[in-house]
């Protein structure tokens, strides 16, 4: 089991660098965004981004998730896997471009042609970047991803400062800077990972069929996941206005801190889950990883809730400061999302994408219904609560369905108690209505309940330092 921990720890270290550096740079940009963009402009940019994320699974057949799974499978030629993904992306981009052209001829009020151009560019660079990063993981080129992620963030930071602060191009400058960063990253992956070697003229039809059979059910899963994470922006815009939607979008920046921790571990874990899957979990590797992941997420979540208002005072300026009120439930939703994804990686390992889709769709339905009801009464805060409930349902359902493939050795009573403690902490934030040291009780309580996991993490970290 030592080698399993070593391999996972190495990847966690690499993904930490590729995730934390860009996130730090992105936080530098938040004051620039909130000073140079209006809430309405930020709302428009957010809607463009979320619309791209909605269309991606349909026009790419969500092939990106098949890329890593099949690149790690020795039964398939890596060149076939890469070429299949590339062809599907190019066909999808052609269709999106055609749709954008049709939209421009309809002269829809408020829909500028410049937005459509950026929309197509955002779609193409996102689709290509997603598949390239997944393929690099599959061929064990994680180090290339690290540098690529940092390079993308540095370009975005520099371009945003130039376009927003110096040239004062507003929303156009923001969109141009983000697109430029993504394009540079794509070129980097191609050059450093020598991906051109994996492009072939002839592709096995069996590879195409197997990849599409694997990824097709995920279209519904990813779409439902999008509903969980992004539909609230549209409903909020419709029911409360674009300015409130922009405020809500900014609120996601603080939960983004927790999302980095989730993303780092998940990126590394998704590789290990496929390589090390054992239905009996004889050495307890998967159970140990689950417990440590769960501890890390709930502990960091609790700490960020404590520091929510001080962080908001630093990051949010002017009218954006009110966004701090929506942060706590969004933080808890990140925890549920993280654990649902952890379990989802096991379903990916056994190639059961149908179960992933069913759980996510049910969660999305509940989320949507709650959005309409809660936003009506509580506006943006209602949207945050609905998101938390949606992810919570997916998490619980996947836990139940997982028993079909593996038996994890967990302390259910402890996990349930800690989740309830997070909810109590969330409620207490609004009762106190200001920063209070009483909030420190909650992270300390979590540490006490997860002492075993704290010791294991310390031992692993100590071993890494010695090496």
Whereabouts are the PLM-identified features?
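Transmembrane helical elements of multi-pass membrane transporters/channels
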Residues: 11-26, 152, 174-189, 193, ...
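Signature of the first transmembrane helix
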Residues: 5-64, 97, 101, 152-157, ...
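N-terminal membrane topogenesis motif
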Residues: 1-25, 76-79, 83, 143, ...
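Membrane-proximal transmembrane or re-entrant/amphipathic helices at the cytosolic face
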Residues: 2, 408, 427-467
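Specific pore-lining/lateral-gate transmembrane helices of multi-pass inner-membrane transport
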Residues: 70-88, 247-360
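Interhelical loop/hinge segments that connect adjacent transmembrane helices in multipass membrane
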Residues: 1-4, 8, 117, 143, ...
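Hydrophobic alpha-helical transmembrane segments
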Residues: 117, 146-195, 362-366, 380-401
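Membrane-water interface segments that mark the loop-to-transmembrane alpha-helix transition
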Residues: 10-22, 47-48, 57-104, 114, ...
